[in-house]
Amino acid sequence: MKFDTVIMGGGLAGLLCGLQLQQHGLRCAIVTRGQSALHFSSGSLDLLSALPNGQPVTDITAGLDALRRQAPEHPYSRLGAQKVLTLAQQAQTLLNASGAQLYGDVQQAHQRVTPLGTLRSTWLSSPEVPVWPLSAQRICVVGVSGLLDFQAHLAAASLRQRDLNVETAEIDLPELDVLRDNPTEFRAVNIARLLDNEEKWQLLYDALSPIATNCDMIIMPACFGLANDTLWRWLNERLPCALTLLPTLPPSVLGIRLHNQLQRQFVRQGGIWMPGDEVKKVTCRRGTVSEIWTRNHADIPLRPRFAVLASGSFFSSGLVAEREGIREPILGLDVQQTATRAEWYQQHFFDPQPWQQFGVVTDDAFRPSLAGNTVENLYAIGSVLAGFDPIAEGCGGGVCAVSALQAAHHIAERAGEQQ
């Protein structure tokens, strides 16, 4: 099977790269094992929240300039501030075209409220998520009886520290009792599958309506809206106060929705989606990828003109830690890491951890190297890259988006030259 590009990994980076390549008229396939890290995320995307020295970033342009001085090997630093902002804006346009109407500005971060009621600087958020400063003084944090994925009293306690009048309440929906037989089934995603049924909308409205008459804003867990935000808009039009939603413990309704919107758009535009499959081997000839072998296709290889590695970091098994060191399991690419295991981590758990910055070594075009030699038609994007800390620096989603589009543009340019 021949393709212009085969992308190994179907997370945020892989999907955005595929969508951008389709804009250039290239035929793409994505090979993915299963759920991506988006399923376990908040659904919000960070661009740059803090510098390596811990300084918070509010002005993104100034932050990118400072980042280049502090971390010259960061994926952003390799591109330059203006290029990062341009690619981030293009990524936001792609996301919106896919149906993910996310709120945010590439020039200025905003503060979203977290499930614990604290604030986190971010780039893009779903319109349901409350953004600081809140537009209300009287707030009610509403939990769902029996839902362990969200603790209303913890969020309320944090918000009270910001001089807000915050109460808590709990709604009980007997229609959800079918899920209570097994506590592991009473999760936000399973609740959403029931509540998203239009026949159940009125039941949720009836439960929230008495609470809404006594406050200016309801904050509740995101336990509906798995496919779209239609129910949230329907409730907001009818309730006498604003309704906002907070992400829950994983799996996350907002994260799954974002992934599904991107995946459906990729397929709608003619992309080949290969779920439940896994790349087992990649054949390289004369420094280029010639064949990709997957588990499900056995002796039928995929033959791409270009290949993209978007396999993620440790969480997605894109990187594997062993006693001898860190390795990239598909091709055995060169990996940036510390010399000894003792340098992988810091003693204090909440300190920035060195292992977060491990990843494959690439050139400035994000082409990785194998035994010191660049693989000419292979690109590495997203969390598998080295040189950044997605947690401490708050840049995970941004690096995925920016590197994906940079690789896509580079591939499209080279593909045009080869025609």
Swiss-Prot record:
Q: How does it sit in the membrane?
A: Peripheral membrane protein
Source organism superkingdom: Bacteria
Gene Ontology biological process terms from the UniProt entry? glycerol catabolic process
Q: What InterPro entries does the annotation carry?
A: FAD-dep_OxRdtase_2_FAD-bd, FAD/NAD-bd_sf, G3P_DH_GlpB_su
Q: Which GO terms describe its cellular component?
A: glycerol-3-phosphate dehydrogenase (FAD) complex; plasma membrane
Q: How does it assemble?
A: Composed of a catalytic GlpA/B dimer and of membrane bound GlpC.
What is the similarity comment for this entry?
Belongs to the anaerobic G-3-P dehydrogenase subunit B family.
- What does the function comment of this entry state? Conversion of glycerol 3-phosphate to dihydroxyacetone. Uses fumarate or nitrate as electron acceptor.
Q: What is this protein called?
A: Anaerobic glycerol-3-phosphate dehydrogenase subunit B
Instruction: List the source organism.
Output: Salmonella typhi
Q: Which gene encodes it?
A: glpB
